[in-house]
Amino acid sequence: MAAKMILFDEEARRALERGVNKLADTVKVTLGPKGRNVVLEKKFGSPQIVNDGVTIAKEIELEDPFENMGAQIVREVASKTNDIAGDGTTTATVLAQAMIREGLKNIAAGANPMILRKGIQKAVDVVVEEIRKMSKKVRGKEDITYVASISAGDEEIGKLVADAMEKVTNDGVITVEESKTTETTLEIVEGMQFDRGYISAYMVTDTERMEAVLDDPYILITDKKISTIQDILPLLEQIVQQGRKLLIIAEDVEGEALATLVVNKLRGTLQCVAVKAPGFGDRRKAMLQDIAILTGGQVISEELGLDLREVKLSQLGRARQVKVQKENTIIVDGAGDPSEIKARIQSIKKQIEETTSDFDREKLQERLAKLAGGVAVIHVGAATETELKEKKLRIEDALAATKAAVEEGIVPGGGTALINAIPALDKLIESLTGDEKTGAMIVRKALEEPLRQIAENAGLDGSVIVNKVKESPAGVGFDALNERFVDMFEAGIVDPTKVTRTAIQNAASAAAMLLTTEAVVAEKPEKEKNPPAPAPDMY
């Protein structure tokens, strides 16, 4: 076991603070509409230029092990805020730094860290309650555009995200992909899409676009492998008599069965497209059931005692249109019973709440979106690779911010909500005494910090701006982009309540942990041994 180095008391806390400051000072230059960028070196490829707090925080490792621990504590604040709210990571870092700085001053002057911690916690509870009271519900597309524009620092991106949210509703999935061109565009996929295409290219109906479009088809959904035509012959005969088209979703269609379907398609006897079932294992069963509910059909499975040879038309699904491409299948306007679809959506929502695995949650959300509203894809375009990565990060932040805003509402942006919470905190401070009061005062001072930093990044005197906002009526804040004092809601400068709340809670949690530290243990770096001298015959 390697030897350890140990620091105590003030020396330990100061080492941690140096690390906190190195990380926070790097991150906070990005705050606000006039925040600058940070360039990150990459082992491979061009450096990455970013404006995103958590991405910068994750890149920072310091040489001194004690300082590095301090930096990692604040990094945890940024990534926790990012995980919960998806945005507000820089604000959280600035708040944590301010609380740690003020707290350490008071501890050095003899305050008791454990009682300070109590005061900090009480103060944060009051501030969070006050932020919730200020919160307004998101009303319509305009509010969403504001939230996304502020988060991404770009009006174009704001409009794009708002369009996407409007099209696919709150339950829909919005994915961000890299575009082949320099344009940033929005594509909406209506209906249910899954990533399986036609089994044979002979099944296409439009050879120019290489896709098969079936209008008003029957849909056979099964988890079996179909290899002999005898299995589905009775069903095919019924469909030919009706003069209808057929989509087969099965584990696989091969051999004689596939050959017969292709020959019939080429002769014009029966228009049929076969695709493999999406997903694997239990997830496949669940997705087939989703498709069945969406289209009003049944999954033909031996587990349910159903045999392919005895399938009736009433057990098949229906849809207004099915579009099958080389790698995707889209079912538009399935004929399922709306009440059953609703029940299925509720069941998936419950599973999302209960699951502990991020991977499972993501897959469940995809299933939910496919049932509920469809999928929007934002194709991000830029002139260079570096710009593309930076733009993609900003769009992802904007998406997270809009989802958070829809969940818990919006508050005045630009650090104004935190300043507006100070009067409520002052009432609490009056009722506290001793070090508990000092703890609450630490939070009070920290609440000014995000606005001060936004003003300083805009090249102005932070303290002057903070005092002016304090004297202004509630809801009036500083528009750093145009350098004027405005009603933040009217000007469309808003932050999601969830983002502001999470930032202050996580910052206080990390600050309280660091302030109550009395000793720090780190591994002693091993001295490199000199390599042995080479033997004479090696030359």
Swiss-Prot record:
Location within or outside the cell: Cytoplasm
Gene Ontology CC entries for this record: cytoplasm
Catalytic activity: ATP + H2O + a folded polypeptide = ADP + phosphate + an unfolded polypeptide
GO molecular function: ATP binding; ATP-dependent protein folding chaperone; isomerase activity; unfolded protein binding
SUPFAM superfamilies, alphabetized: GroEL apical domain-like, GroEL equatorial domain-like, GroEL-intermediate domain like
One GO term (biological process): protein refolding
Location, primary (coarse class): cytoplasm
Subunit structure: Forms a cylinder of 14 subunits composed of two heptameric rings stacked back-to-back. Interacts with the co-chaperonin GroES.
Protein name: Chaperonin GroEL
